[in-house]
């Protein structure tokens, strides 16, 4: 593909790094250092110039398969989308935005934008489920099914047993899509034994997620629902998380040292949330019992700070603690410290864009476990040529993942179903390194 990326910051750099294999990638930015860094480290073309100036685009290929705008400015991203249409023929455009107003279908249609990403909004959505399933570390929802992918840490005294045996003890439909053990991620088969302290990625319907609690969590964990939450960080993500929690009936407080952020948060939340500036650090607030809360979220843009505050809150006995992860390099560390990790805005922008690029009209997919795992879905629609047939599963594919079929809110192992029926959903769990093989297999008989 011919790919143009407007913006050479952290998000643009990581997208270019991922796409440079088997694609022709050009990155545009007026920051000379950023362009130099990209040219020295990546096999892409860097253009140093003003993204808002049409002359910057002269000389690029007139046929562009994918245009991605990921600067920190909505206005720049939208303007670049207009400019590129006058310079080249563009098949697909993905634009990163901060203000959800610009993500409306009307604006997308007028500017010929294929898809928009609003990272602060998308990054806040897992909290809809983390309140209901407080024993889960993270949760992802999917098209075509009500099943969720939730990560749960097994308790210290968990009795090792095979996955197939364990699933038989759960009330409801559940499958295991991945395991992180001793800092390594892998996709298990049902014959794999699960061990204490494993971080398990369960694919399950809501009733099964509830029943998992008594089996996998510490005995002394309180069963009372989450009623209150403190969010440390009043920028856009903290505000979006607060909106989600308020809709769930949670009493929310937001803290920040920045008085201007507090003022803006208070205006946007319309007094539905207590927002206050504090000159104290979070450790002082926790140690002095300045608040009593069921849930603590460290939502600043500094991962080291978030990690520190999560550890302090954990020592104070707060039952649910979540740290926002802004830098991919800290993702594994946070999970290994048993911090419940939710993607921050920049990481969310990166993964959301990759997920959209690698999805199609046939399959959809999402990354998990810090990008080490991928779950790929294909629905069998009423007019699908797959109805009454079945994709053969060769060993070279089967060895690279775990495959299930969703049918009428039931989960079946792939090999147990003889033929596909209308509305079946084929689900494949795999390592990110094997995604291309699984994707190619699922694209058969479109």
What are these regions (language model features)?
Residues 1-446:
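Cytosolic regulatory regions of ion transport systems
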């Amino acid at each position: 593909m011919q790919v143009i990326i407007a913006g050479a910051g952290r998000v643009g750099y990581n997208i270019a790094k991922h796409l440079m294999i088997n694609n022709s990638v050009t990155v545009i930015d007026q920051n000379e250092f950023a362009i130099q860094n990209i040219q020295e480290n990546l096999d892409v073309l860097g253009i140093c110039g003003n993204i808002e100036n049409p002359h910057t685009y002269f000389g690029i290929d007139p046929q562009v398969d994918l245009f991605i705008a990921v600067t920190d400015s909505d206005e720049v991203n939208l303007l670049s989308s207009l400019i590129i249409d006058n310079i080249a023929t563009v098949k697909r455009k993905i634009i990163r935005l901060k203000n959800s107003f610009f993500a409306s279908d009307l604006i997308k249609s007028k500017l010929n934008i294929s898809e928009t990403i609003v990272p602060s909004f998308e990054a806040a959505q897992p909290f809809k489920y983390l309140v209901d399933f407080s024993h889960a570390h993270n949760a992802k929802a999917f098209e075509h099914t009500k099943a969720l992918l939730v990560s749960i840490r097994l308790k210290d005294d968990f009795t090792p047993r095979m996955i197939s045996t364990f699933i038989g003890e759960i009330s409801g439909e559940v499958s295991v899509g991945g395991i992180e053990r001793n800092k390594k991620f892998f996709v298990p088969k049902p014959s794999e034994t699960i061990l204490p302290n494993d971080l398990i990625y369960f694919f399950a319907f809501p009733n099964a997620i509830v029943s998992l609690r008594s089996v996998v969590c510490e005995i002394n964990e309180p069963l009372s629902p989450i009623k209150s939450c403190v969010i440390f960080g009043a920028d856009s993500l903290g505000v979006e998380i607060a909106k989600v929690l308020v809709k769930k009936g949670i009493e929310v407080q937001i803290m920040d040292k920045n008085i201007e952020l507090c003022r803006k948060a208070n205006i946007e939340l319309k007094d539905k949330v207590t927002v206050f500036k504090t000159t104290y650090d979070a450790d002082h607030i926790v140690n002095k019992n300045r608040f009593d809360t069921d849930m603590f979220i460290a939502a600043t843009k500094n991962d080291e700070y978030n990690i520190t505050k999560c550890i302090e809150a954990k020592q104070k006995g707060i039952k649910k603690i979540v740290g926002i992860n802004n830098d991919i390099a800290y993702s594994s560390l946070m999970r290994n410290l048993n911090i419940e990790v939710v993607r921050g805005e920049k990481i969310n922008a990166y993964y959301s864009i990759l997920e959209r690029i690698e999805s199609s009209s046939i399959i959809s997919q999402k990354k998990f476990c810090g990008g080490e795992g991928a779950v790929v879905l294909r629905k069998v629609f009423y007019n699908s040529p797959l109805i009454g047939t079945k994709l053969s599963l060769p060993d070279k594919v089967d060895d690279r993942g775990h495959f299930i079929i969703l049918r009428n809110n039931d989960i079946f192992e792939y090999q147990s179903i003889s033929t596909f029926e209308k509305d079946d959903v084929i689900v494949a769990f795999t390592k990110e390194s094997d995604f291309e093989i699984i994707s190619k297999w699922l694209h058969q008989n479109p």
